[in-house]
């Protein structure tokens, strides 16, 4: 089944990308995007930000006011600050609770769309061969391993194909990462050489 073969491959690529970037980084990015949309979360985020600015502003005014020379003004600012701080803490708790629910939902959807979907495919298509091997191409013992656990003999099961995809994607990802690091390292080395050569030329001109 070519479609199943490609689907499993792309799922493992998606899992590798998520693990490489970091699930927490992706969650933070999704939360940032979500709070920019016209939703209740964006309204709550704006209210929280405004309350925080108000608390900070009142705190600055309090610090700039003498509690001895301008006690009445200072006391009024103190009451306003305490009230604003209390309202901010209530709003911040609501916002944090909403964000926690969002993180749980994102984690559940991410697992269901990647690892959970792979497990479902492996269970549902456990008897379906990914592709068929040529007859008498390899020993029957190897054929049995490749068809494990429930695919017909002489075929490759979805479990074996999934494991091969995971290994292949990891190796390719490591190779790409090593290449990028090498290229950036070479670029930094060339810049260091150029800087060193420029310093030598300047020193020669001074002499």
Curated annotation (Swiss-Prot):
The chain crosses the membrane at residues 5-24, 111-131, 156-172. It is found in: Endoplasmic reticulum membrane. Residues 44-97 form a coiled coil. GO terms for cellular component: endoplasmic reticulum membrane; GET complex. Residues 1-4, 132-155 are lumenal. It is a multi-pass membrane protein. One of its GO terms (molecular function) is protein-membrane adaptor activity. Residues 25-110, 173-207 are cytoplasmic. The keyword Transport applies. Pfam families: CHD5. It comes from the Eukaryota. GO terms for biological process: tail-anchored membrane protein insertion into ER membrane. Required for the post-translational delivery of tail-anchored (TA) proteins to the endoplasmic reticulum. Acts as a membrane receptor for soluble GET3, which recognizes and selectively binds the transmembrane domain of TA proteins in the cytosol. Interacts with GET3. Belongs to the WRB/GET1 family. This is Protein GET1. It comes from Paracoccidioides lutzii (strain ATCC MYA-826 / Pb01) (Paracoccidioides brasiliensis).
